[in-house]
Amino acid sequence: MTLVRLSAAALTIALAAPLTFLGARAQQDTNSANYIMLGCEAFLLDPIPTSKLLVAGVCAGIIDTLQAIKPNICLPGISTRRLLVRGVVTYINNNPARLHENFIDLAGEALEQTWPCAKQ
């Protein structure tokens, strides 16, 4: 009976070992600029690739929300969602060492730096 248990334990370990490697791989941070920038860059394409539609919508939605709630962003009279996304993409691409940072924080900073309000 002991031999059967040892064999079963060895088989379980042998079968589970490859799963450990899958779990050990680093999870991708879906809140990082590195991840969401894929959607922002896809948003600027015409048409947006089907495989990137969801993350492109996430990017545009975050940027729309930020420009609506941040009081220190002063957009030009005529501004489009594409213009806002392009501004954020340009800012983040000019700061590649920060791609690991939270996209919302970085996009908010990008909007404030790209379209600051005049000081009173």
Question: Model-derived features: where do they sit?
Answer:
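Bacterial N-terminal signal peptides that target proteins for export
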Residues: 1-11
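Sec/Tat signal peptide C-region and signal peptidase I cleavage site
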Residues: 20-28
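Compact alpha-helical subdomains of small soluble proteins
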Residues: 66-120
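Short N-proximal segments of mature Sec-exported proteins
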Residues: 27-90
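Bacterial N-terminal signal peptides
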Residues: 10-20
